[in-house]
Amino acid sequence: MTGAGPGLTPELAVGYLQELSADIRAAVVLTPGGEPVAGPPELAAAASRLLAAAPEAAEIEVAVAAGAVHAARGERHAVVAVCGRYALPALIRYDLKVVLGELAADPDGGEPAERTEAA
């Protein structure tokens, strides 16, 4: 698998995850504190609650009949992915770790650039 490349932003990370696996239905990137950075807003609140429920866990997997939710944390970001029922957990966890590594390598920290008003 080829890495996402340097300068992966949280917005690009969400799309990259969905390209990596057809089983990933949606993904969200959050700060370590659970604040949403990128991804669908309707997923961000639930993802934040999931991470808050297991504050010491580096990885989380919740499976139900319809699919699974996988989460992974790094020092600078957390990533949560909603997957279909046939997703392979080990591969999804690997993909999440790859994305976390690429986000950590971003010199800007994955934060949106400051916007300046045009004069």
Each language-model region and where it sits:
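Non-catalytic interaction/Regulatory regions outside core domains
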Residues: 1-119
